[in-house]
Amino acid sequence: MRQLLLLRRSLISVRFSSYSVSPQATISHDGPNPPTLAEHVDITIAGGGLVGSAMALAFASSPLFKSYKIVLLESQSKLPQVSKNKPYSNRVCALNAQSINLFETFDQEHPSENDSLACIVENDVIQSCLLERLKQFHIEPRLNSKVKNFEYEENSIRIKLQDEKINLRTGLLIAADGYQSSIREMARISTMQWDYNQYGIVATLQLADNMPDNIVAWQRFLPTGPIACLPLSNTHSSLVWTVPKSMHKTLMQLSDEQFVAEINKAFTSDVYKQSGTISITERIRSYWQKLIPVSPTTFQYPPVIINIEPRSRAAFPLTLLNANQYARPRLVLIGDSAHRIHPMAGQGVNMGFGDVLCLINILEQAVRDGADFSSLTYLVDYERQRQLQCLARLLSIDSLNRLYSTSFSPIVALRSVGLSFVNEFSLLKKFFAKQAASRS
C-alpha cells in the first residue's frame, strides 16, 4: 500500500467554505498597440508543480486571503494522473516534518500522528492531492500558460502570456517555474551556481519476496557518490544513485539485469571499501568500546533488488544554485526558481515547501497589519529569512558531498568512525533521530 495514502484522503476529504471567481476584464491602451484584454488578479503563481500548487493552496485555505483572486499558471499541457493500478513513479520525495506541518494547515481536522523521520511519497501523488484540494476552492491550473514577459505598472505587474490574447494584471507575481526559471532571467536576478559533474540516476526497484517490512531508507556513501534506496512498499523501493558524468552513460546503457546486479553490488560489495582505512577504523572502534560499553546491535542488511520497473530508469545532471535575490517589488521566487540543492539529503522539495510556509506566514501578517501584502517591506522579510536558512542548508549539504567524495584515507577513516560511533550508541542515535523528526 502506498505511503501517505492517509494524507491523500485527508487532503481531499476536508471541507472548507469556497468562493467563486469571475474574471474582470478591462481595456488596456498602451502606446500604438491595439487594445488587449487585461484580467485583474491579486496573485499570480507561475508554475503548477509541487511547490507552486502548494503555494496556491496555502493562499486558498487561508481565511485572510479568502476574498483574493489567485491564478495558477502551468506551462504543461496535461496534469499528472494517479491510479492505484499504475506502476510506482521514479520521481519521489522524502517529506520531512516541516513539510507535513504545511500539509496539516490544509487539513486541520486530521492532524498527522506520524513521528517518522520522513515519509516517502511519489511526486505525482502529492501534486494530484494538492490539485484535487484546489478544485474545492474553484482554482484549477491554467494549462499551456507560460509567462512570455512582464512589465511594471504603477500598482501592478502586467503579464503577457505566450499564445494568449489576454494579459494579466497582478498585484504579486510568484515564480515557481523551476531551476531554469524564465521569470528569474527576465528579472535579471543573478545566481550563484556550479555543476557537480555528477548525474543522479533514478529508478523504481522491485524487491525480493522474502524481505521483512520495508520501512527503512538505506544510503551508502561510495567513492563515486552516494546511493540511496527509499521504501515505497514491501515490494518496491525508489533508487537515487549519484555517479560521475563519466560513469552515468555506462550505467544507463546496461540491460535491466546488469543494472540490478550493479545496484546490489553497490550496496553490499566490499569492492568499494578502501582497504587502508578498514584497519584504522577497527582499531579506533575497539579502543572506544573498552572505554564506553555499548549495547550490542543487530546488523541489518539492505533489501535484495530483483528487478526494476520497465522504463523507470532516468538520469539528470546535478547542480547547485542559489538566486542572489529572492524578492523584487511585487515579485518573489520560491522553490527551485530560488535554489537547487544536491539530492543526497532529500531536501530539495522540502526547502520549497519551507518557502511556501514562510511566505504565507509573512503575507498573512501584512494583511493583519492592514498593509499592502505585495509591499517590498514584507517581501524582503521573506527573502532575509529564507536566504539565511536555504544558503546554510545548501552549503552544509555541499560540504557533506565533498566530504564523502574524497578518497583521502584519514578523512575516510574519520567519517567512518563517526558514523559507527553514532550507530552503536543508542542514546546518541535517538537524539539525532528526534532532532531530524522535530516539527519546529
What are the functions of these language-model segments?
Residues 44-46, 58-89:
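Glycine-rich FAD pyrophosphate-binding loop
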Residues 35-40, 105-186, 192-204:
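Conserved N-terminal helical subregion
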Residues 325-343:
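Short FAD-binding loop at a beta-strand-to-alpha-helix junction that anchors the flavin cofactor
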Residues 83-105:
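N-terminal FAD cofactor-binding segment of flavoenzymes
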Residues 164-165, 173-298, 310-313, 327:
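Conserved FAD-binding catalytic core of PHBH/FMO-like flavoproteins
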Residues 33-51, 71:
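Beta1/beta-strand and adjacent pyrophosphate-binding region of the FAD-binding site
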